[in-house]
Curated annotation (Swiss-Prot):
This is Parvalbumin beta 2. It comes from Merluccius polli (Benguela hake). InterPro entries: EF-hand-dom_pair, EF_Hand_1_Ca_BS, EF_hand_dom, Parvalbumin. GO terms for molecular function: calcium ion binding. Gene3D superfamilies: EF-hand. Ca(2+) 2 binds at residues 90, 92, 94, 96, 101.
Length: 108
């Protein structure tokens, strides 16, 4: 799903670092997976991979399964992790993360 954008080894390392429930930190994950240093175009491409229902927004249910987009065997985020992730990215308070909010969140 992320071929040509992110390296498999970086994805594996980023997932390993947050295997335990409650240890997910979006800033650390974005940095480890190599997304932070990517071009605006690649960051947008990643958004559209994560936006599973193609609504143009990443909603709470998609955030909960965020890690599984990177690897099917990964865990779901806890409710607390999901809500913190959403709160960090949803700057306009509409309950979802749009593509522009995503770009800001990745570079935060």
């Amino acid at each position: 799903a992320f071929s040509g954008i992110l390296a498999e080894a970086d994805i594996a390392a980023a997932l390993k670092a947050c295997e335990a429930a409650g240890t997910f930190n979006y800033k650390a994950f974005f940095a480890k997976v190599g997304l932070t240093g990517k071009s605006a175009d690649d960051i947008k491409k990643a958004f559209f991979v994560i936006d599973q229902d193609k609504s143009g927004f990443i909603e709470e249910d998609e955030l909960k399964l965020f890690l599984q987009v990177f690897s099917a065997g990964a865990r779901a985020l806890t409710d607390a992790e999901t809500k913190a992730f959403l709160k960090a990215g949803d700057s306009d308070g509409d309950g979802a993360i749009g593509v522009d909010e995503w770009a800001v969140l990745v570079k935060a």
